[in-house]
């Protein structure tokens, strides 16, 4: 495979080439939309499988709502829609027809819709239309619903996985009787995202809440996880919102409480998307090939027999049959408080006669399969195989009977090593400053913790002058308020340090 551009040479081109050579995705014939190839989609399926188990273990249920939403629904919550109104795709007609000369297909002007439909940019409005029918009493609450869906936002600047017109995501929309219960739900599910980030994505993000001026439209609180990419930028990888009664009032969703009084329902929402795949690529990969946390890799092990004749291959496959039987029952225990099930070890056998061993090795190193097991016929009598560890790049000879027993330790050590490396990278590139001159000097390649006076005006001034934004108020700083702290620009009182960074 061709050598890829290094991160130092051109970070953006490095990312694009890695996505292409690892056969994860490509641009499609539809502007801004991507084709997710089987290898890339397998990663999304693994993300989805893990998160879905987490959701169900926290008593959430899946549902499906329409892709097309009446435009009038969006007028009920105008402030919410303002965030993405310019990105909405609109359906105006319901039929095509042949032109009079039968040379082309045209839109039938007589098939104009009475009301235009919006291709789902997010589902709050259509879901709350259903909730109005579902909720009458406090006994109907809480509703804990998640949807796996595709979404359309007509992005002008697109980049595979990170920003595309169409993408896949999950969206939670929960309804509650009290504000306390709703906010507790928002925080609990942020913890689910944080657990997933650390234990499966092998990431060490900063966790906190957004400042008031940067909350999700209509939210009373927005919580977020913010990891650092290898180019020192932040990427908002997950958010959780407590929205109070705003949507309950907009859609007139009321319930009778325990005192037989009418109240508006409280609401929370949150989502993550295929953007996570871009996050994984940029967080762990190096200048040579893709690097993935083993727990989310499409395959954990690839087994490559080395043979000259069909007879050699048959002998090797017979030799390996006991291994296959054990591998079929092998599993990995994730250290997550939200996952009860083990993850089944996934393996692949490559006996393709059209590719040389060298080409196979190169392909699996680029795509990053954590362990490669190579089997020569000469090793049959010693009952051993060669194991290549993709993280350490070390080759060891291992007895066949010992291989499956060692798999879990090797793979989970790889997982933990990636997490510790990511955590060390973020901590080594995080700086605490007290003056604006120092801030401007460091912000290009650091996460910066600095005091802020709490005003949108100061945040906007910093963004205009440095392109850095407040990513979040970290949880540990939110509880460390001190009247003696001052903002680095205005010299007004500052209650806490906040995280500043440049971002995607």
Whereabouts are the PLM-identified features?
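NTP/phosphate- and nucleic-acid-binding module
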Residues: 1-504
């Amino acid at each position: 495979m061709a050598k890829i551009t290094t991160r130092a040479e051109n970070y953006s081109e490095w990312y694009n080439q890695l996505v292409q050579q690892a056969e994860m995705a490509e641009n499609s014939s539809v502007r801004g939309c991507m084709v997710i190839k089987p290898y890339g989609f397998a990663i999304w399926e693994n993300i989805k499988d893990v998160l879905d188990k987490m959701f169900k273990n926290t008593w959430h249920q899946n549902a499906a709502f329409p892709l097309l939403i009446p435009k009038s629904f969006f007028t009920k919550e105008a402030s919410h829609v303002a965030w993405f109104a310019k990105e909405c795709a609109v359906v105006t007609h319901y039929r095509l027809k042949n032109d009079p000369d039968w040379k082309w297909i045209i839109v039938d002007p007589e098939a104009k819709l009475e009301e235009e439909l919006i291709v789902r940019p997010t589902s709050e409005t259509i879901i709350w239309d259903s909730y109005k029918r579902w909720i009458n009493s406090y006994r109907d609450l809480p509703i804990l619903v998640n949807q796996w869906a595709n979404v359309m936002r007509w992005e002008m600047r697109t980049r595979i996985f990170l920003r595309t017109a169409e993408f896949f995501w999950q969206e939670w929309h929960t309804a509650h009787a009290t504000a306390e219960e709703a906010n507790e739900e928002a925080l609990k599910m942020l913890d689910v995202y944080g657990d997933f980030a650390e234990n499966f994505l092998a990431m060490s993000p900063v966790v906190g809440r957004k400042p008031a001026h940067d909350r999700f439209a209509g939210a009373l609180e927005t919580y977020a996880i913010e990891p650092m990419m290898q180019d020192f930028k932040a990427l908002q990888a997950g958010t959780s919102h407590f929205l109070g009664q705003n949507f309950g009032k907009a859609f007139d969703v009321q319930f009778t409480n325990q005192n037989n009084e009418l109240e508006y329902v409280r609401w929370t929402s949150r989502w993550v998307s295929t953007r996570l795949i871009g996050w994984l690529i940029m967080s762990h990969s190096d200048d040579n090939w893709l690097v993935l946390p083993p727990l989310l890799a499409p395959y954990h092990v690839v087994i490559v027999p080395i043979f000259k004749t069909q007879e050699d291959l048959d002998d090797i496959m017979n030799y390996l049959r006991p291994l296959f039987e054990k591998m079929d029952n092998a599993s990995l225990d994730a250290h997550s408080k939200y996952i009860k099930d083990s993850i089944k070890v996934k393996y692949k056998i490559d006996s393709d006669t059209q590719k040389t061993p060298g080409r196979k090795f190169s392909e699996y190193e680029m795509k990053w399969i954590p362990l490669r097991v190579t089997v020569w016929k000469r090793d049959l009598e010693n009952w051993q195989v060669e194991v290549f560890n993709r993280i350490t790049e070390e080759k060891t000879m291992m007895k066949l009977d010992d291989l499956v027993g060692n798999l879990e330790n090797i793979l989970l050590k790889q997982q933990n090593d990636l997490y510790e490396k990511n955590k060390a990278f973020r901590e080594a590139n995080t700086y605490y400053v007290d003056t604006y001159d120092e801030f401007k000097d460091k912000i290009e390649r650091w996460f910066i913790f600095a005091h802020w006076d709490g005003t949108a005006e100061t945040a906007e001034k910093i963004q205009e002058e440095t392109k850095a934004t407040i990513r979040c108020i970290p949880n540990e700083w939110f509880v460390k308020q001190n009247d003696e702290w001052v903002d680095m620009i205005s010299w007004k009182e500052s209650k806490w340090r906040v995280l500043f960074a440049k971002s995607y």
